[in-house]
Amino acid sequence: SAPNQLEWVYPANPGSEDRATRFNRELIDETTIEDWTPQFTLTKGNTESTGSLLPCNDLHQPEKFSGFDVLSVLSFDISEGLTEGAGVGVLASGQTVYSSMDRFYIATTKWVDAEISEDEFAEWSESYSTDIHAFSIGVDTPAQYVASGIVAGTLLNQFSMDEHEGFLRIITTTGSPWDEQNLSESQLVVMKEKDNLLERVGLVSGLGKGESLYSARLLDDVGFAVTFRQIDPFYVLDLNDPFNPDIVGELKIPGFSTYLHPIDEKHVIGIGQNATDEGRVLGLKVSLFDVSDKTDPRETATWTMNDANSPAERDHRAFQVYGQTVILPVQSWSEKFNGAVLLEIGDGKISYVGEITHETESTEPVSDCRELTAVEFEGTQFEIWIEEYGGYIQLCKATDNGGYEDSWCESIPLSAIDNWYGD
């Protein structure tokens, strides 16, 4: 949460800085603690209550400045509602969340001073960093702030983080894939709590030099990462020794995976896009990787659909697997398909089972020109719209798939049809 919106004065030029500073100091003097601490509003039925989310003694400040926001981590019994003292706060911003059974991590790209000069910004942009804040969590105790740390580079998503046996593993990307002077590459950093700090104890770099990180998955003593620019290097990481992680396997294939999902100890599914050897994207691709030999990963099977994508590429919640059956929502613009496909995984193969379409009989395509009237849209927002312009006509060529019964290809006001098409 951010502090309450105070009416700060921002100087318009260097000569007004002193005046703005004096005004803002007076504004601060007039504030109360409630203006700076996180607040809550609880709505229950027809009643509403408000209050302070956390007392001051439960707010912490990292050793290094991490922003003006307050990160609040709460532990509470839903049946009892929110109560004061049920959590902890840290003066920092937050973007990405990952949780183990007893630790809760929040990461964010490092805050930048707004007054930084252009030269300093250029130098800073070459060395992005990520702040990480750790909290202890438990069933019977409120969340507690534990430690903070910094790693070089930017974080892709929550699957780039994982905790195993007290060690936090995190994959970040440094540099830029398009800057020849400072080419990007990804790295895996292992961190350990010491006092109130997350300290680096292990590192392996060199993942995808000159490429961007597209997906990652860290599981116990093994990790997987996919980078891409023209081809897809699929990396296997040995995490058995947290002090000496290592890249032990690499596979170069066309396309890339943006979501990796383990099927069993020997197989991983990749959801992403197929591509040419030059990096031109072709459509949806599902890959099956055999990782039984960490030093020799293999893509044993693929399933593709041209000109298609899946929400599962961006949101893992759209991916479903039941035993050996994968259910994947798919949208294809060339085949005009919108629905889900069922794939069977087994014996190193991906087998197409069937599909479920989301189209209905009410959306059968038409290919004629027809008049759209207010009667057709009675009771909808389009009724007034059509009456105002004296009706509309739907224009579709006979060879086109046309619009649908509840939509249109191109709608032209009848009163203006001559202006568009003459006779």
Language model features with spans:
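Beta-sheet-rich non-transmembrane sensory/scaffold domains
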Residues: 1-423
